[in-house]
Amino acid sequence: RTPLSEDNLPQFYYIHKPKGSADDGFKYKGVAPTGPLPASVDFPLYPQEEPEQFKALLFGDPQPRNQQEVDYITHDVVEALVGKTDASFGVTLGDIAFDNLETFEPLNRSIAMIGIPWYNVLGNHDINYDARNRRNSNETYERIYGPSYYSFDHGPVHFLVLDDIEWMLKDPATGKWGYRGGFGPEQLEFIKNDLAMIPEDQLVVLMMHIPLIQVNDRHGLYRLIEKRPFSLSISAHTHTMEHHYITDQDGWQGPQPHHHIINVTVCGSWWSGAPDERGIPHAMMSDGAPNGCSLISFDGQKYSLRFLPAGRDPNWQMKIDLPEELKTSQTAETPVYANVFEGSIHSTVEMRIDETSEWKPMEHVGEVDPLFVRTSQHEAQLLDLKPNDWRKMPKPGICTHLWKLNLPALAPGQHHIEVRTTDQFGQSDLGHRSVRVVAD
């Protein structure tokens, strides 16, 4: 492996900018002048065991606005991993900060407590908004983390960290600058040259911030990876948890759909929602899933993903929702909803009642999460009484991992509901909920 900084950031690069960054007037500074090129640039490498099987932690959008939100991250996510994870390294999938680039370093110090090498991806909230071209927009990021795109191997897997933040003049009439998803020809050439050295039967994992399906020049990347039998891409950005399978409907020409994961975010819904007993907002995402991170496991060319909810038992993998009390005449008309956080179209989800009935398949639906809607409405009423007590939750979004099934007709009494699920990786989980039925 390469050397690590005191914050466990891999030191695999040398920055040569004799006059420093072109960042005159930037709010956040870039690279200081490096002076003349040294006589040699040396990269020590240290031997380490890299077995066929290994794991990595994935953080989407920690996105702290200030030190208080860095503390939220520390208490809600980091502390549970310190001394307890068997991951070989971790990756933050962009939006390391929320425009305030002074939070980079305190967040680095927090994540460093996990005790493993930590790679970083550039996000749209990690750039210098003062820049007037893409090349200079990454100067502060580059000073702390190094290049915005690069590659590395761990064990049998090849990783490509990509920069898909295209900083551009959005409106020439007003002079307004903004971003869109884009790799650019220079980076696509780098990817082409990099992959030319990677055997066809090696798993390639591409990590970026904006989801691949939203990147303007994604078809150029498709052409570079679609003939490879083993590839995976991972992003964040949307503050949801999603699995996408890219096909010819989006211009993919490979023999099999390409799996793209949109990872859960550490900050959830930007630290919105009422605080818990620790003073930390619940931060439920707009798809009804909690904030948290993921653990990805590799075994040669195979991989699997595990959702790690923040501040909860790691075995909590779903929410089951229905009213607390129903009349007997209502039961057969009442749906049970199961929000399976890491679920996809390839998951099986089934339900049974009172541990004696048969398991019945639940229907995968594209709806908003009803518990998110109720929570949002309730909190909005409280905020009307006490404005500014916490940040208002976002609008609900369509959940891609929601299932439902109506209850059968039930007699009065307390009834136990079980939901079981098996995901595309063969991982099984069980959820429980009870309902009280009263006579009409």
Q: What residue ranges belong to the model's regions?
A:
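Short beta-strand elements
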Residues: 10-20, 24-25, 424-440
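Extended active-site neighborhood of metal-dependent phosphoesterases/phosphodiesterases
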Residues: 12-33, 101-200, 218-234, 238-299, ...
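N-terminal active-site segment of His-dependent metallophosphoesterases
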Residues: 19-104, 193, 439
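Surface-exposed, short loops/turns at beta-strand junctions within beta-sandwich domains
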Residues: 35, 407-413
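Active-site glycine-centered loops adjacent to acidic/histidine catalytic or metal-binding residues
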Residues: 61, 94-95, 123-124, 209, ...
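Aromatic sugar-binding surface patches on proteins
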Residues: 116, 368-406
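Short acidic, glycine-rich surface-loop motifs adjacent to enzyme active sites
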Residues: 194-214
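Binuclear metal-dependent phosphoesterase catalytic core
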Residues: 254-343, 347-350, 402, 406-407, ...
